[in-house]
Regions:
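Catalytic alpha/beta core domains of metabolic enzymes, predominantly
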Residues: 48-49, 60-169
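Active-site beta->alpha loop and helix N-cap motifs at the rims of alpha/beta catalytic domains
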Residues: 1-64, 74
Length: 170
């Protein structure tokens, strides 16, 4: 329920509930993406708006390095219905700390396509990316290889995907 204001995000969350959505997710406020306290107020308001499970779409700006797993989890524990997060950040150390410290209680999803396989190795429950639909075979191969215990093949699939990504982002 990305919106330019908390009020709009609340309206969208309520609309999602009325249409039968299974859950809602939200990014931090667009005008203060690195202010975690402001984000918590925003997330709490959305969480209070419905009884739907709530996911945080974690997408820090490139300059944000102050977040710790402890701070993230302690803050979001106060958000009603918080059940998981989509982690769109290249900081796999922080992602793994979040997975570890949440004790498997949260649904942890990775975002960057470039680190999908590494995310699986760090404990990701799933992935939401932007290029899976243009090269599904590669990502299915990656997932199936990882699930069958063949990490080498999963990493080879990641290399294939990253070659395509390098061309797309050129």
């Amino acid at each position: 329920v990305g919106a330019t204001s908390t009020e709009n995000a609340i309206d969208l969350a309520k609309h999602a509930k009325s249409t039968g959505a299974d859950a809602v997710s939200s990014i931090a406020p667009i005008d203060a993406p690195d202010d975690f306290e402001t984000a918590l107020t925003h997330y709490s308001a959305i969480g209070e708006a419905t009884d739907l499970p709530f996911y945080v779409y974690w997408f820090p700006s490139s300059g944000s390095t102050a977040m710790t797993a402890e701070r993230f989890l302690e803050g979001l524990a106060k958000v009603r219905n918080f059940v998981g997060f989509k982690f769109t950040d290249m900081n796999l150390y922080l992602f793994n700390r979040l997975v570890d410290q949440s004790g498997g209680e949260l649904n942890a999803i990775t975002g960057p396509d470039e680190i999908c396989a590494a995310g699986m190795m760090m404990g990701s429950d799933g992935a939401v990316g932007s290029t899976y639909n243009i090269m599904p075979r590669i990502f299915i191969e990656m997932y199936e290889s990882f699930q069958s215990g063949n990490v080498k093949e999963a990493m080879e699939a990641q290399v294939k995907a990253n070659r395509v990504l390098a061309l797309l982002f050129k």
